[in-house]
């Protein structure tokens, strides 16, 4: 299981009401991971939680309701990496599509298309949101 799959599991547990700090501490105590891996998991996990309103807004603009929690978490992680981290676009898109292929080739292609479209549109999108709604841009509940 790779790091993104583990982050997906952590986010699913968080959505069930478990405390983020407890989840992360338990994960680190039960798994042997390097310092860079720990930093990556921490950044992505807390980053997705911190920007949940923004990420869900962007996902819902490009997809109908994503029914599978796993895929929604995967999109959240990938959108976060594309927007807030200096992650290589090709790597994020490829890894997202590969993880989604567990649900079938068509799902992998769907995720690939959604991520590529978002990457092309994100700069204009961020400017547009900045002008329209700071609550969405900064994930501040209204």
What residue ranges belong to the model's regions?
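Class I Rossmann-like S-adenosyl-L-methionine
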Residues: 1-142
């Amino acid at each position: 299981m790779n790091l993104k799959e583990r982050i997906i599991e952590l986010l699913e547990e968080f959505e069930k009401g478990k405390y983020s700090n407890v989840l992360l501490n338990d994960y680190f105590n039960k798994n042997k991971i390097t310092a860079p891996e720990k930093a990556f998991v921490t950044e992505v996990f807390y980053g997705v939680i911190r920007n949940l309103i923004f990420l869900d807004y962007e996902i819902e603009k490009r997809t109908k309701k994503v029914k599978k929690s796993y895929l929604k978490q995967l999109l959240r992680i990938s959108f976060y990496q594309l927007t807030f981290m200096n992650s290589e676009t090709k790597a994020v898109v490829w890894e997202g599509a590969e993880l989604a292929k567990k649900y079938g080739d068509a799902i992998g292609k769907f995720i690939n298309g959604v991520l590529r479209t978002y990457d092309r549109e994100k700069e204009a999108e961020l400017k547009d949101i900045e002008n329209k709604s700071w609550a969405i841009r900064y994930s501040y509940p209204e």
